[in-house]
Amino acid sequence: MPRAVNGTIHKNRRRRVLKDAKGFRGARSKLYRTAKSAVMKAGQWAYRDRRAKKRDFRKLWIIRINAAARENGLSYSVFMNSLKKLGINMDRKSLAELAFNDREVFNALVEKIKVAG
C-alpha cells in the first residue's frame, strides 16, 4: 500500500499554519516552511510581550502620577509614601487614571497629603 501524502491531518496542519501566517509579508505567508518558522517566532514574541506589557503599563502609570504630583510640588516617592501613611490604598492604575482624566480629584488628594504632612 503506497504512502498517503495528502491526508486530511496533514492538510489541516498546513492550513492552520498558513492561516496563522496570514498578513505576513512575502513568502512568510505563502510557503509552508517559512510560514511555520515565522509563526513560531511570532508566538515567541507574543509570549514575551504579554509579560513586557505589564511592566510597560506600570512604567506609564508611574510617569503620569509623577508628572501630576510634581505640578503640585511633590515628588512621586513622597506622594506614594504619604498615601500609604494616610491609609489611602489606591493602586497606581487608578491614581494614573485620576491624574490623567480627573485632575481635580487628584489635586484634592495632594491637598489632603499636604494638610496631613
Curated annotation (Swiss-Prot):
SUPFAM superfamilies: Ribosomal protein L20. The keyword Lyase does not apply. Keywords: Ribonucleoprotein, Ribosomal protein, RNA-binding, rRNA-binding. One of its GO terms (cellular component) is ribonucleoprotein complex. The keyword Ribosomal protein applies. GO terms for molecular function: rRNA binding; structural constituent of ribosome. One of its GO terms (biological process) is translation. PANTHER family: 39S RIBOSOMAL PROTEIN L20 (PTHR10986). Binds directly to 23S ribosomal RNA and is necessary for the in vitro assembly process of the 50S ribosomal subunit. It is not involved in the protein synthesizing functions of that subunit. HAMAP family: Ribosomal_bL20. Belongs to the bacterial ribosomal protein bL20 family. This is Large ribosomal subunit protein bL20. It comes from Leptospira borgpetersenii serovar Hardjo-bovis (strain JB197). The lineage of its organism: Bacteria, Pseudomonadati, Spirochaetota, Spirochaetia, Leptospirales.
